[in-house]
Design a protein with these regions (language model features):
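Active-site-proximal or metal-binding-adjacent scaffold patches in catalytic folds
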Residues: 1-84, 93-130
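Walker B catalytic acidic pair
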Residues: 89
Length: 130
């Protein structure tokens, strides 16, 4: 089975659970680029209702670690786009939504660049994230 088929096969949509393959990438990116500091209870899944590439939402207003990252399958047709979008959404979580796309977000993006997140092969062999 190829990468894309494996990622989509049996993916839950709105059941409150992560898509296992997406969650594995979340954990990998968390370790590699966020020092494992992001919460592990984040739900990471395909979302058929997501109109944008991806979106992160709070799952519980009283739990500062409870987030859902939803990805639109059609707007993430490649590994590069999907994992770039995931890093983007993870950066929002790292900032706890205190800075939408302002100076703190820019600083976080520069940190990802410095750590090599967008170098060819940084996450998947022979793939560059954009």
């Amino acid at each position: 089975m190829d990468w894309w088929s494996e990622l989509i096969d049996g993916a839950p949509m709105r059941d409150g659970k992560s898509t296992p393959s997406l969650k594995r990438y979340y954990r990998l990116l968390n370790r590699k680029f966020f020092n494992g500091d992001l919460p592990d209870n984040v739900i990471v899944r395909w979302d058929a209702d997501e109109p944008d590439v991806a979106c992160t939402e709070k799952r519980d207003k009283d739990d500062t670690t409870a987030y859902v990252i939803g990805f639109n399958r059609k707007k993430n047709p490649t590994k590069s786009l999907l994992l770039s979008a995931m890093l983007h959404e993870m950066l929002h979580i790292s900032l706890k939504f205190k800075d939408n796309h302002g100076p703190a977000f820019d600083k976080g993006h520069r940190m990802l660049v410095k750590k090599g997140a967008f170098r060819k092969g940084a996450v998947i062999p022979d793939v560059t994230l954009f």
